[in-house]
Each structure stands twice: as C-alpha cells, then as structure tokens.
Amino acid sequence: MVNDDFQEYVKQLVTKHRDERIYPFQYEGKKYWLKQPEKLKGIWLLLKPHPKKSFKNELYTLLKLAEQNAPVPKVSYYSDHFFVLENVGLTVSQWLCNKNIDEQQKFLIIYDACLALIDLHAKNLVHGRPAIRDITWDKGKVTFLDFESRSNSQNQNWVVIRDMLFFFDSLCREEDISDTFIQKVALYYQTHCKAKNWQNMIVFLQRFSWVYYLLLPFKPIAKTDLIAIYRLFEILLINKK
C-alpha cells in the first residue's frame, strides 16, 4: 500500500504531464513510470480509435497477471486515468545492442527471456507482442511490458504461435544482432519449449512461405520491416531445409 505523500506526488505529476503517455520519475531513490491513455490526433484517431479502452485493458491485464504470479511490473498506484509502475530495468533490446557487453552475457540474457516466455505459455498465458523491446532483464529477473496488443483469439495454439513469431521477428529487426546469434537462440528455444509449440510455428511458416518468395524481389530495396521478414523465414525455415 502506497502512502498518502506518494499518492499526492503522483497526482501532481498527472496534472503537470497530462499530455504525456509515459513519464519516468524518481521517488525516495526508486524509479517509477507514470502511464496515461494516449492523446491521439489526425490519422491516429482512425488507426487507434479507442485509446482509453486499450489503457483500461492493459491495466486490468497487469493486475490479473500479477494475481497469477506472472512476470509483470508491479502496479504501485492506479486510478481510472493513470497507473504507476515500478521500474524493472533495461529492455532485452537495450542489453543485446549494447556494444560494451560480451556475447556470453548477451546469450545469458536472451536465454532467460526465452525461458520466461516458455514458462508464460506453460501457464496458459500469452503476451500478445513479446518483442525484445517489451521485455526487461535485471540481474536474472525477466519482466514483460506492454500488454495492450493482446489477441482476442480463443485459439490457444494460434496465440502462442503469434507470441513466438513476434519474439523472433523482434530479434530479426535488430541490425546489431547477427543471424548466427538468432540461430543459436532459436535452437535454445526449440530445445526448451513444448515440441508441439515449435512444430506449430514451423507449420505456420511453411504454410505462408509463399509470402517470403512473393516479397523476395524487393529485397535489394527493403527497409527494416521487410528485412525482418526475410531474416525470420531464412533463419527459422529456409536455411534449415
């Protein structure tokens, strides 16, 4: 239970930073994140028509997952129009793209992230978009962020496949992460996850491999999104044949 001084301080921040979706702050030596619904303008009103609903869904999801002991940030304080999260360290993306960290440490971090996602699925829970920028690592502790993009599908096999594809796609998006590194991560994940989940993902990629070949002529001019798709198919499917 947070004290009255903390609550009052947060309310002042909400008033002062009401147009900021995410605002970091320090209180008594600890770092927190204040999160509010997005304030959208222009085309984004069409692309994301229900920011308040998405915000409430994320808060509800965080609270429910915390009850199930899932690795999510602690919600320190919340109301209908904001919530405060305790800081949970750097993202996996930040760790892996840090040139001052050796590869052995990077493998340790990404392997921890793999096991955390596998464990989440073993509990019949899904994230919805477990990109490495939405996963943090701090001294061996893995935490999942940003549950706003969770799928409404009731097909458990599909939502697990979706999680796995988002995870590997996010690795493929990073220029600083080599194909060899991702191949080792894929082998580690395959070794430790349920065989059925890995096979389901491979079957999905095989079924949609035509997309890879359809997009292949554009490879010389491809940008980040397309490059990630090429790498995803090549690392997990094409080059393993």
Segments predicted by a language model, with ranges:
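ATP-binding glycine-rich loop module of kinase domains
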Residues: Q12-L13, R18-K56
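Conserved structural core of kinase catalytic domains
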Residues: E38, S54, V72-I110
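Structural motif at the C-terminus of the N-lobe alphaC helix and the adjacent alphaC-beta4 loop
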Residues: K56-A70
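Conserved hydrophobic alpha-helix
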Residues: L65, A113-L120
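Catalytic-loop of the protein kinase fold
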Residues: A122-I132
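C-lobe/activation-segment region of protein kinase-like
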Residues: T143, F147-K241
